[in-house]
Amino acid sequence: MPEGNKLFDTLSQLPLFNLLCGHDGLTCDFDWKHVFKRFRNTDLHKNSFSIDHVLITIEIIRGQLLSLGLSSTTANSLLSPNDKQDFVLMIKLLSSISSLPECDADERLTVIATCRVLHLLGRVYFYLLHAYLNIKLSLDEQLTYLSAAAHLILALYHSNKHDFIPVQFYFDVMSMIKNVYFCMAKTQIDNPVAQFWIILLGTDGLEKVFRKVQTMVGSDTNADQLQLANWIDGAVQCINILEEHPEWGADS
């Protein structure tokens, strides 16, 4: 980002913040719901992960969930969901891990090490979940929570590399957090008194457009570049109309 523009003046005040971006402050983004699912799937898909040379398996997580008072059936459903895209189960699992307490000092050293690692991972989930889902937080508190999550993820990845999460996933989650700060700064510059909701970021708007395109064209799914551009333009107009008149939609 070139020095001297308003966006640089705003974001350069943040120590260690990554100011690399495209033309005119363009940044990539990843949908927060998909990022959360990937945290869940990364933990479960590999059957184990390692932080600070402490191996965490699904059985260890199951034991910790049972210690919270969850039933065996509930713990199994959270760790072995029939639908890998089940958003509610994913939130429940990450929230449960974020609620794990610290171990008693008189426990065995291996148990203390395991609890410490899970408690640390739970802090990551806590900050991410509350930043996006706690409606009582102010924007300043949301940004503070995202910053805390980013610092923890950076430290964990620096120490553990792919034993913690894959490098591509690390890039994606850090890009998601970075984009929130960029979008906030752009809004602050364009309209200092405007309201800003980070939960509206992501790909929901794009997915809504493609769903509308699919509904409009039916089985005629093949298209050249010009046809697709026309379809998307029509879909966007329909979505804008329905946002102004929701009573005209299918649910009315």
Annotate the PLM regions.
Residues M1-S252:
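Non-catalytic regulatory appendages
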